[in-house]
Amino acid sequence: MIVNEQLAIDHGLKKDEYKKICDLLKRVPNITELGIFSAMWNEHCSYKSSRFHLKNLPTKGKNVIQGPGENAGVIDIGDDDAIVFKIESHNHPSFIEPYQGAATGVGGIMRDVFTMGARPIANLNSIHFGSPQHKKTKNLLRGVVHGIGGYGNCMGVPTIAGQTSFDESYNGNILVNAMTLGHVKKDKIFYSKAAGLGKPVIYVGSKTGRDGIHGASMASASFDDKIEEKKPTVQVGDPFTEKLLLEACLELMAGDSIIAIQDMGAAGLTSSSIEMASKGNLGIEINLSKVPCREANMSPYEIMLSESQERMLIVLENGKEEMAKKIFDKWNLDFAVIGQTTKSKKIELYFNEEKVADIPVNTLVENSPMYDRKWKKAKLPKRIKVDKEQFKTLKVKNVLNKILSNPNVCSKEWIWQQYDHTVMGDTIQKPGGDAGVVRVHGTNKAVAASVDSSAVYCWAHPLSGGKQIVCESWRNLISVGAKPIAITNCLNFGSPENEENMGEFVECVQGLGEASAYLEFPVVSGNVSFYNQTKDIGIKPTPAIGGVGLIKDYQNMVTMDLKEADNILLVIGKTEGHLDQSLFARDILNEKNGPPPEINLFNEKNNGETILKLINKKFIKSAHDVSLGGIITALSKMCIKGKKGATLKKSNYLINQFEYLFGEDQGRYIIEISKDDLENATKILQENSVHFDELGLVNEDGLIIDDKTKVSIDDLIKSHTNWLTNYMEN
């Protein structure tokens, strides 16, 4: 095949990028080399439009063992224990083929974690779909949920938390972000940096097929009218093989034979071999004729770019090949010595005794493009002027019913009941709470994790939205009694070639960085997914934040369910009734303008740290952060979980009742405290200058909002739980 500029463009490269390749090589690349460059230089693998801005994120902290740059981030949780975690996107494949796209997204992120020596202990996900009225939404949701459950359940890893949202901006591009946590001892962490010369390079796992070729390139482009033609680029997963691969790798890792290990994810054998060589500042020579293939007559181009799943690349110590082979034979997995490390600092590929590629590693990595793209700064929208006369026509009970049954608020039990959330026996807080919690096996420690995003806030003002979503993650961890330690992010945006989209990305990252730095909540891993658009219609900016925190004694964990009648309910944080960009404004007033609520980072940190003090003194019986839908929505969920009611104090309505109940001011929590502990608890709040108000009392009767408004617990449950089940089953 003749390689020329047009063929390079067909591979997703720009004209100037193709010229740069020819200049670096001092010749025209052959077809295999062109394929390798197209994979390594695409947006998905090279981060060419985002690296310039991501370098400013805070990535260090006293608990950080490994930050961005490896397969996953690693944090120290004490006693020689570490948690490995990361979130990644599988958006484009999941829109084309929802079951396999979601399944292989889960499989890929689990491999990232166990590649580093950690046994996966928990999965989470953040999934976003178009309008419920859109013709594709229901089938896409069903396929994605089945794919996530099908893979995670077969692997025997619990899915402990997640987020699901609906918005018309996802009609043409759904988002599927998968997150995994793993546990490892600090002295058994493995890395992908190759070292030593003449070391054997080993291929293990499944055979290589033609599935997923150009998967990474497809994830670096917008959709058009030919979406169906892209189905062959979607990988096909086999969780049972991955389970075997997990156990085989962990068995091999128990010894001292592994120098470096890398899973074959995006761009397959291409990215895994090049990343190992680049980090080790050496070369790798591979004989592609030795790669186990499941299809006949595969070319070097196909072998290098295949994204067949459940495969690993390992650099071993010399003389350990037979021992390693016995392990993988025992687990019925392919094992092949396909090459060796060299001093050439090149990727050299052979096929049928012919050299088919010869590329200096630095041309693929250090010399890959990096763009400081043009971007537009977003203006902070003006506050909306609400005509409060229209409130007179509204009834609180009717509004609450509508808010609780909103697709973005309602119970997602239909989804998470399809996931095994108790397998492994260490889940101590299941989905549906502020965060999922798993015990660190054999210890009193527990790890809490949540995943959050707020596309509406980020769309209204990206800088504020970026801050808010980090703070939301922080509050969710605080609410279960966990000290927040670190985050991973999945940054989902439209085309970076559009100045407005790029501006959304830049300012969201700035906001994210500011909040992370202030809260001492560093970013240890992540992923960028651009080109989430069909033709020129892009998604709302959707950064998803996966937060991880530590509970030193799992018996101090807190849940959101109300516990006992006559206990006191306090609102922590000041309530000013911010309705702009609230669910009330959008759903009830049909008002979509205005700025998101203001973020006060001092209050966020101070409020959260003070609540942890109260939790550690066992003053707090239940807690829940206040977010979408405001105070009354948060309180309703606490009532539903505990099957208890609450009576609100009438004196709260110093501002308009609807502003008080449904405003989305940030930095707030509802906490339940016994009357006996109230004096001591409020003393701590006052000593730490934390604003609080008495919200009311827990009761057994229902939610009593005022003299005219009482909602039974059964009605709350019905409003909150029925929508999704009815939508999916009718």
UniProtKB/Swiss-Prot annotation:
UniProt-annotated catalytic positions: H44, H90 (proton acceptor)
GO molecular function list: ATP binding; magnesium ion binding; phosphoribosylformylglycinamidine synthase activity
Cellular location(s): Cytoplasm
Protein name per its UniProtKB record: Phosphoribosylformylglycinamidine synthase subunit PurL
GO cellular component, one term: cytoplasm
SUPFAM superfamilies: PurM C-terminal domain-like, PurM N-terminal domain-like
Complex formation: Monomer. Part of the FGAM synthase complex composed of 1 PurL, 1 PurQ and 2 PurS subunits.
Organism: Pelagibacter ubique (strain HTCC1062)
Record-linked InterPro entries: PRibForGlyAmidine_synth_PurL (IPR010074), PurL_linker (IPR041609), PurM-like_C_dom (IPR010918), PurM-like_C_sf (IPR036676), PurM-like_N (IPR016188), PurM-like_N_sf (IPR036921)
Listed EC numbers: 6.3.5.3
Keyword terms: ATP-binding, Cytoplasm, Ligase, Magnesium, Metal-binding, Nucleotide-binding, Purine biosynthesis
Keyword hit for ATP-binding: yes
Chain sites annotated for binding substrate: S89, H90, N91, H92, R111, Q235, E307, S308, Q309, S529
UniProt record, GO biological process: 'de novo' IMP biosynthetic process
Pathway: Purine metabolism; IMP biosynthesis via de novo pathway; 5-amino-1-(5-phospho-D-ribosyl)imidazole from N(2)-formyl-N(1)-(5-phospho-D-ribosyl)glycinamide: step 1/2
